[in-house]
Design a protein with these regions (language model features):
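HhH-family (HhH-GPD) DNA N-glycosylase catalytic core used in base-excision repair
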Residues: 1-331
């Protein structure tokens, strides 16, 4: 089956590369990806023919199903985030417009079929380079345990060393078991995915040992339609601080004890019946959510890309940074 999709302001490589959904794909060439794990593994190929057109090839004759899957997994379920920039506060709008122009066409892929695969990639990413280590570990896991979650949970140390010897790999069975137990208490994965994303986030943090705010946010952002979710990492804090997005007052990162029982806003509180966090005024996640709203996940992804390429914590590339004129932290 061949299918062509018209797209507006979209970049396939820029959208998939930083996303955890990329863990079930493999980039074959510029603008060309094939699915290597999960649903339609080995049957789906996607290529960006030109800025306004994608080519989809799939070894199944179910065009409606494939189109829906592709729209979710490529981030096409949401309009270009650039369209929402004019609604931002004037104090940050010009900086974010310029930052967006450096990374045009970025969307947020989500997976509604391969949630356990995404969870594996997310938990492996804790303090690990995604491109160098996580993708390599994932490929080995897909090859050895593809679709057999119980076998991975019950794997002993000798089996796990076939994947890697890092603590991230060794902890994987325990974290997967915690996720399964958490979703079973709710009636299964389908029931979990029907929860409000803010509540799902809090439940993961509360019930899954070893899962804190960053990992929970990363998972929810990758499997729910929840573009406001902001995983807080060093790139986000560094870039946001240097660009003047979070003010001069010192901010705090989200914490597991608070995030397991509170939410960041009155709106989230009304949807989840959880109280508003007492730290909202000083928490970087809450502060940025109030500022950018639905653009939260998009902003986090852009700061990840920008932080990795230019705005590094150590030895930043200020002399070639496209944002150097707007940076309040450059020497």
């Amino acid at each position: 089956m061949r299918l062509q999709l018209a797209v507006d302001l979209y970049d396939l490589d820029l959208s998939l590369t930083p996303s955890f959904v990329s863990s079930v794909y493999e980039r074959k060439a510029k603008g060309e990806w094939v699915k290597v794990a999960g649903y339609l593994s080995g049957k789906l190929m996607i290529k960006q023919l030109k800025p306004s057109k994608l080519l989809i090839k799939c070894l199944t004759d179910q065009p409606k199903l494939v189109k829906k899957l592709v729209e979710y997994e490529l981030g096409l379920w949401h309009e270009p985030f650039e369209h929402g920039l004019d609604k931002l506060p004037r104090s940050v709008r010009s900086v974010l417009v310029k930052l967006a122009s450096a990374y045009p066409g970025l969307r947020l892929p989500i997976s509604y079929r391969d949630q356990f695969y995404i969870f594996v990639a997310v938990v492996l990413s804790r303090r690990a380079n995604y491109d160098r280590w996580v993708l390599k570990w994932c490929k080995r896991i897909w090859r050895l345990y593809d679709g057999r979650l119980e076998a991975l949970i019950n794997a002993d140390r000798s089996e796990l060393t076939r994947i890697g010897s890092s603590y991230q790999v060794m902890l994987l069975p325990t974290l997967l078991k915690g996720l399964l137990e958490a979703v079973r208490c709710l009636g299964g994965l389908s029931s979990f995915l029907k929860l409000d994303p803010n509540l799902a986030r809090a439940l993961l943090i509360k019930r899954c040992k070893g899962i804190g705010p960053k990992l929970s946010d990363s998972f929810v952002l990758s499997v729910f339609k929840a573009p406001h979710i902001i995983p807080c990492d060093v790139h986000l804090v560094t870039v946001a601080s240097r660009m003047g997005l979070i003010g001069e007052a010192k901010v705090k990162l989200p914490s597991k004890p608070l995030c397991s029982k509170y939410v960041c806003s009155e709106k989230a509180s009304s949807l989840t019946r959880l109280p508003v966090c007492p730290r909202t005024s000083s928490c970087v996640r809450s502060r940025l959510q109030r500022m950018v709203g639905e653009l939260g996940g998009w902003l986090q992804t852009i700061t990840y890309l920008h932080g990795r390429s230019y705005c590094r914590t150590l030895r930043p590339k200020c002399n070639v940074c496209p944002m150097r004129e707007d940076c309040k932290g450059r020497p």
